[in-house]
Amino acid sequence: MITSSLSIMELLKNKLFEFPALVDGLKNKDYNFLELLEAWMKETEAILVNHKFSEGAIIAGYRSRIIAPLFADTQKRSARKRQLQVASEVLFEIQNTVFLVINPIEIKIDEARNLLIHLLSITKQSEAIKYNESIDFQSFISQIWKLFSTHEQLKPSSIKILTLVSQIDALRIMAEEINLSEWK
């Protein structure tokens, strides 16, 4: 089964949107910062691992660096302070690891979206397909996609789109971009 690039990007972007609050927690010396950071890292790691991204292991490696002071023999500083020090040193790398996963996905999705917007514009202007309320929205989108994938001049672009995103993602992008009132 092909995994939705849109879904992966949304999940990881949502995790990144939570990141500023973690940084603020460190800055404000929030007592729960380490627990919140660990929970965030575990959730992000799970998303990455579940979608077969090796960066999940990198996040786990950063977690191990933060946990390591708990097992150090030195007693010069408390383990918690050493953990906070390590966490502050790796925060950017943690965020950047997730960003580096999202960025190429986002580039492909944006390219596919631009191609789809172009194809939709051409199709709408040609009036080759019109929307009427007797068919449901999903059928309407499927009808447009069928035109894209069978029309001699549009087919190369639809093939290019499928090299960037799955067909399900392409249909979802189309659903986001279509304003039905313009298709009547």
What is each stretch, according to the model?
Residues 159-184:
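Extended, charged low-complexity segments
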